[in-house]
Amino acid sequence: PDGTEYSGLSAPDFMSVREESRTFEQVEAYTGGVVTLLGVGEPKQVLGIRVSDGFFDLLGLRTALGRGFLPEENGPGRNRVVVLDHGFWQREFGGDAGVVGRTLSLGGEPYTVVGVLERGARPPAPGDVYAPLEYDETFSAATAQGRRSEYLGVLGRAGQGVDAGRVRADLERIG
């Protein structure tokens, strides 16, 4: 209704924009889906959102407990950490501050809780649990097929004084 067009980017296209843009100060990505949570009462389906390491910072979102994600946690095999949504933490863990450091099973894999978002945090991709994106071979710019899989939501902050025309031209230059 506001005239804004929304579409996804492939992982290689996201990395190209992130690395080659001359107009964005910061570019972050997210994707999500339903995952099974075990170890907290009965098994249940929760909404899991994978985000790039600077996603929370770009949006000005802070943690009430613990921390957000570190850049190295986007590496293969190093992304088994989660940040919980504040409301989810209240409902499922009764607001227990001892949740930080606890291990949860999500989709059959162990994840360590490293933080809880502050009350009132409203990310554009609301979820119950947030985990880092895994930058691996699917993020390789050389993977042509990967460019056809446009599953990432992408957000960016343009530099001071950069208008929409310059951003558009920059994105066209990148491809």
Q: Predicted regions span which residues?
A:
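Mid-to-C-terminal secondary-structure elements
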Residues: 34-35, 47-71, 80-175
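Membrane-proximal extracellular/periplasmic loop immediately following the first transmembrane helix
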Residues: 1-34, 149-155, 170
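Short acidic, glycine/proline-rich loop/turn micro-motifs
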Residues: 38-41
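Acyl-group handling in specialized metabolite and lipid biosynthesis
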Residues: 1-5, 44-47, 73
